[in-house]
C-alpha cells in the first residue's frame, strides 16, 4: 500500500498530468500537434503525408470541428497542424489562419492507416526528404508510468475523500482554472436547430443547457479551450459543468465547489484507468458521468450518499457507445446529465445487473464491459471508413 503521504503526492501528480487544457477535440489536437512536429519549412514541397492512427483517434477526429478552420474532420486537422506551432501542443490550432489553397494541395497527398493501439499518432511526410514525428501514450505524448497508474487504481473512495479535505494550493489553482475555462465554453442556450431545451425543473434545465451547449460548441470547433480530464475535453466538461450549474442555482459556495470538482476529477480519472482511454463505450457519459455523480452527491449530501449515487448511475447508462467525436456527442451528454441527476435521488440494490457492492466494484464492472466491446468498436470503424 502507498503511505498516507505518498497517497497525497500520488494523487497530486496524477491530477497535474490528467487535467490539462486542450483547444478543440483532443484527437484532432493530437493529429495537428504531431503534424506540427514533423512539418518541413516549405509546405509546398510535400509529396505525401501518411498518418498512422489508433482506432480511437481516427474515430474521434473523423467528423469533429477543427478550431479556426470552419471545417470538420482529419484533413483540416492536418492542414491546421501544418499552419500551427509545435510549442502550442494540444492548442496547436490557436491563432492559425486557414489556407484553402494548402488544403487543395494536400488533399490528394494524404494517406491514413488505422491500427489497433493505445493512443497513437505517427506522421510521415515525404518532401525533399522524409520528416517523421509520433505522439503516443497520451494526447500530449507525456505519459504517466504504469506503476503510477496502478498505484492510483489501488486507491479507495475514502482516499479521495480524505484528499479533498486538504487540497494542495497547486491543485486548487488547476481546479479554479478548470472551472473558469469550462464555464467559458457554455452559452445560455443551445441552438434551436440542434435541440430545444426548456424543462420545468430549474436545476436540471440549467445543468443541461450549461453542459450541452459547451459540448456542442466544442464539437463544432469553437476557438475556446476546454480543460480535458483523462485525455478527453468532453469528459472534462461532463465531469464539471453539471456541478458548476448546480452551484450557480443554489448560490455560489467556492470551497464546496472546489472540493466537489476535485472529487469529480479524481473519480473520472479512476474510472478511465479501469477501462481504456478510448473504447467503444462512451467515456464522456460513463467516466465523466461517474465523476459528476460523485461531485454532485458530495455537494448536495456530503459523503453519505456518494456510493449509492454511483450504484444508481451504474444501473442506468453504461454501454452507450462512442461512434466518434461530433456534434451528436452533445445529445449523448444530455442523456448523461439526466442519468446523473436521477442517480442523486434513487437507490438500486447490488443484486441488479452490473451494479457493484461498492464504489470500486461498480467502476471495475463498467470497465470490464468497456473492454469487452472491442468488436463493436471494430464495426464502428468499418462504418466510418465506408462513409463517402
Curated annotation (Swiss-Prot):
First-level EC class: lyase
Effect after changing residue 323 to N: Retains 50% of wild-type activity
UniProt cross-references to InterPro entries, sorted A to Z: Ser_deHydtase-like_asu, UPF0597
Binding site for [4Fe-4S] cluster: 282, 322, 329
UniProt KW Iron-sulfur keyword: yes
Molecular function per GO: 4 iron, 4 sulfur cluster binding; L-cysteine desulfhydrase activity; metal ion binding
Catalytic machinery residues: 25
pH dependence remark: Optimum pH is 7.6.
Reaction(s) this enzyme catalyzes, per UniProt: L-cysteine + H2O = hydrogen sulfide + pyruvate + NH4(+) + H(+)
Free-text comment on the cofactor: Binds 1 [4Fe-4S] cluster per subunit.
Cofactor requirements of the protein: [4Fe-4S] cluster
Pfam families: SDH_alpha (PF03313)
Entry EC no(s): 4.4.1.28
One GO BP annotation of this record: L-cysteine catabolic process to pyruvate
Keywords: 4Fe-4S, Iron, Iron-sulfur, Lyase, Metal-binding
Assembly and interaction partners: Homotrimer.
Function: Catalyzes the cleavage of L-cysteine to form 2-aminoprop-2-enoate and sulfide. The former then spontaneously hydrolyzes to pyruvate and NH(3). May be responsible for the production of sulfide required for the biosynthesis of iron-sulfur centers in this archaea. Is very specific for L-cysteine, with no activity being detected with D-cysteine, L-homocysteine, 3-mercaptopropionate (cysteine without the amino group), cysteamine (cysteine without the carboxylate), or mercaptolactate (the hydroxyl analog of cysteine).
Sequence similarity: Belongs to the L-cysteine desulfidase family.
Protein name as catalogued: L-cysteine desulfidase
Organism (species): Methanocaldococcus jannaschii (strain ATCC 43067 / DSM 2661 / JAL-1 / JCM 10045 / NBRC 100440) (Methanococcus jannaschii)
Amino acid at each position: 500500500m502507498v503511505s498516507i503521504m505518498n497517497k497525497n503526492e500520488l494523487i497530486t501528480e496524477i491530477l497535474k498530468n490528467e487535467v490539462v487544457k486542450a483547444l478543440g477535440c483532443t484527437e484532432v489536437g493530437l493529429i495537428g500537434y504531431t503534424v506540427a512536429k514533423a512539418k518541413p519549412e516549405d509546405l509546398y514541397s510535400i509529396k505525401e503525408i501518411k498518418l498512422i492512427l489508433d482506432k480511437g483517434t481516427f474515430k474521434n477526429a473523423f467528423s469533429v470541428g477543427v478550431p479556426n478552420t470552419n471545417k470538420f474532420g482529419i484533413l483540416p486537422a492536418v492542414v491546421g497542424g501544418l499552419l500551427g506551432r509545435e510549442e502550442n501542443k494540444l492548442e496547436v490550432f490557436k491563432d492559425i489562419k486557414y489556407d484553402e489553397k494548402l488544403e487543395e494541395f494536400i488533399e490528394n497527398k494524404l494517406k491514413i492507416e488505422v491500427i489497433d493501439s493505445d493512443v497513437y499518432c505517427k506522421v510521415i511526410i515525404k518532401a525533399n526528404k522524409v520528416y517523421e514525428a509520433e505522439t503516443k501514450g497520451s494526447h500530449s505524448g507525456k505519459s504517466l508510468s504504469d506503476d503510477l497508474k496502478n498505484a492510483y487504481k489501488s486507491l479507495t473512495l475514502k482516499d479521495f475523500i480524505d484528499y479533498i479535505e486538504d487540497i494542495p494550493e497547486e491543485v486548487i489553482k488547476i481546479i479554479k482554472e478548470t472551472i473558469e475555462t469550462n464555464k467559458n465554453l457554455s452559452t445560455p442556450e443551445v441552438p434551436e436547430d440542434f435541440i430545444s431545451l426548456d424543462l420545468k425543473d430549474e436545476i436540471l434545465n440549467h445543468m443541461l443547457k450549461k453542459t450541452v451547449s459547451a459540448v456542442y460548441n466544442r464539437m463544432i470547433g469553437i476557438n475556446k479551450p476546454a480543460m480535458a480530464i483523462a485525455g478527453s475535453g468532453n469528459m472534462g466538461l461532463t465531469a464539471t459543468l453539471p456541478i458548476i450549474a448546480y452551484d450557480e442555482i443554489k448560490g455560489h459556495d467556492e470551497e464546496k465547489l472546489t472540493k466537489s470538482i476535485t472529487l469529480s476529477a479524481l473519480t473520472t480519472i479512476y474510472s478511465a484507468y479501469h477501462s481504456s482511454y478510448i473504447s467503444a463505450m462512451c467515456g464522456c457519459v460513463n467516466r465523466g458521468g461517474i465523476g459528476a455523480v460523485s461531485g454532485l452527491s458530495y455537494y448536495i449530501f456530503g459523503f453519505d450518499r456518494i456510493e449509492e449515487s454511483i450504484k444508481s448511475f451504474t444501473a442506468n447508462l453504461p454501454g452507450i457507445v462512442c461512434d466518434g467525436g461530433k456534434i451528436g456527442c452533445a445529445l449523448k451528454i444530455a442523456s448523461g446529465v439526466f442519468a446523473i441527476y436521477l442517480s442523486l435521488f434513487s437507490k438500486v440494490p447490488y443484486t441488479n445487473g452490473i451494479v457493484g457492492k461498492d464504489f470500486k466494484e461498480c467502476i471495475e464492472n463498467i470497465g470490464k464491459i468497456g473492454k469487452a466491446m472491442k468488436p463493436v468498436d471494430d464495426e464502428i470503424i468499418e462504418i466510418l471508413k465506408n462513409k463517402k
